[in-house]
Amino acid sequence: ILSAMLAYKTLYWIIGFFFTRKFKPAKNKHKYGIVIAARNEEKVIGNLLDSINKQDYPKDLLTVFVVADNCTDNTAIEAKKAGAKVISCTEKVSTKGEVLKYTFDLFKDNNKIDAYAIFDADNIVHHDFLAKMNDMINSGYSVAQGFRDTKNISDNWLTSSYAILYYFQSLFLNESRYNMGRSSFLNGTGFVIKKEVIDKHGFNPKTVTEDVEFTAM
């Protein structure tokens, strides 16, 4: 049994490392609502929004929403300075998943959004992220997870460990499953999901690991 499990994992590693599926750049440009759940993130939200503003994607097709989750600092002010629209979430919420549900419910009847892009407030986004994600959506995928990396990989053993974990998840799990035509799993941030999926199936996670829970759904 152990040999079979090892062979199974080895096959995944080989496929993830040596093979890749190609897709054509999309001609059809979708409209994205970028959603950022933020609670007291005034020190980092500007860096994320700056990277979003530098995306290689038509700016008129992007709307950035910072959901200020019961903030007691200047997160909303910093977000507005960077051009984002601020949504004040004053309801009693305890998880990021609940904040996302609150936001998706607000936009249920909004026909100006084709898909959501989800980020954490301390992220920095590569300049071609949305262009690549649009290629995936235009190829027929309803959900797409981006590559996740660590900004401060050399700070200490913990950040280095996270970098290894993210690389393992992206290359040896998600990339392999994608190359085999199978479903991958969401990794909490840096993913895109078509609005029609949320509208049809809902988004009501019950745990703090909303990404894993929604993947299973």
What does each model-found stretch correspond to?
Residues 1-28, 79, 174:
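N-terminal membrane-anchoring/stem segments of glycan-assembly enzymes
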Residues 30-33, 63, 213:
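Cell-envelope/extracellular polymer assembly enzymes that use nucleotide-activated donors
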Residues 44-46, 73-80, 128:
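Acidic helix N-cap motif at the loop->helix transition within catalytic regions
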Residues 50-61:
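Short, acidic, metal-binding catalytic loop of nucleotide-sugar glycosyltransferases
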Residues 68-76, 91-93, 124:
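A conserved acidic beta->alpha catalytic loop
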Residues 74, 120-136:
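Acidic donor-binding/catalytic loop of UDP-sugar-dependent glycosyltransferases
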Residues 88, 95-99, 103, 107-109, ...:
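Long helical/loop segments within the catalytic core of UDP-sugar-dependent glycosyltransferases
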Residues 110-124:
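Short beta-strand-to-loop acidic/aromatic patch adjacent to the donor-nucleotide binding site
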